[in-house]
């Protein structure tokens, strides 16, 4: 398993002590634009979010949005867990004081969920906010039904 951790520190064990018991090597990189491209081929990306939560949120959204890297797991202090929202794009989070067993289980689960194929619905066409259901003859934009005649739908 290839794990990358974005952190200003050079040792992952200083951020998350449980990493020293993992059988996978963790590559620590600074959170600078020149290192973001390496996250694309990582199985899991750990993001040190113990300090600057605003910057961590922006980086998490970048990695899971335009960068389209593997699943991102935030490393937080206990107080930071209250701030994290779904719009950050993180797959999971772990507290800095997590045990090796908890960290290992979370990494396995996050990786497994990321590898699960999404079901393909061949009767639905999605382009941005527009969703067309060819079997129900409906079209929606941002969730609102568009009133189309049969000819317009075709």
What are the functions of these language-model segments?
Residues 7, 48, 95, 148:
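Small/polar loops that bind or transfer phosphate-bearing groups
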Residues 112-151:
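Short, Lys/Arg-enriched segments at the junction into DNA-binding effector domains
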């Amino acid at each position: 398993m290839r794990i990358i951790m974005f952190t200003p520190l050079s040792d992952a064990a200083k951020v998350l002590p449980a990493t020293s018991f993992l059988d996978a090597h963790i590559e620590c990189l600074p959170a600078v634009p020149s290192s973001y491209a390496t996250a694309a081929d990582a199985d899991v990306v750990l993001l040190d979010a113990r300090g600057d939560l605003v910057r961590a949120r922006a980086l998490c959204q970048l990695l899971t949005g335009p960068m389209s890297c593997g699943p991102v797991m935030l490393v937080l202090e206990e107080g930071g867990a209250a701030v994290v929202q779904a719009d950050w794009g993180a797959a999971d989070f772990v507290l800095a004081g997590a045990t090796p067993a908890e960290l290992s289980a979370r990494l396995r689960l996050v990786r497994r969920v990321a590898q699960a194929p999404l079901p393909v619905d061949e009767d639905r066409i999605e382009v941005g906010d527009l969703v067309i259901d060819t079997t129900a003859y409906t079209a929606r934009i941002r969730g609102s039904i568009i009133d189309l005649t049969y000819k317009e739908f075709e």
